[in-house]
Amino acid sequence: HIFTEFGSFTVGESGATLFSIINQKQQNDRESWYMIDSSFMTTLPDIWGINQRYILLAINNWDKEYQRVFLGGLTCDSEDYYNGESHSNAIFLPKLNGGPQYIGFFHTGAYQESLGGFGGIQHCLIPAPKHIIIDREKGDNEYYTRLFAKEQSYRSMMRILGY
């Protein structure tokens, strides 16, 4: 009998996390920050915990002009950011043009959900994100999605806290 654990090195490409850019902040004359709609500390804890590198891509607006950016999360914690300098030389994403901008971290593996927890109370009360399963039938080129779990509601978080 062979026992194994399906982690980053065997099924790492099975995980992806998508974020929406909710705002842009000009820190100084050189630093343009894109703020995501979640927290790196709760959604992808290995980013700040062990400086894990992931494939980062823009999901849309590939035909737009790009600029160097820094990525920050929603919390007030000084560690809630994606350090482009330790993960790659620089991060370049499409310039914001008033429409939505989505980004994806790919090959996140099996551990981020276990480390961040699902359905419990997250750092700074950031709700657990919606989870979807993307699949396709063998021999079919179409992808199908189904909802695995809705985004965590404030009611469920308050219930866990005893309110």
Ranges and model annotations:
Residues 1-163:
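Charged (often Lys/Glu-rich) extended helix/loop segments that serve as interaction or gating elements
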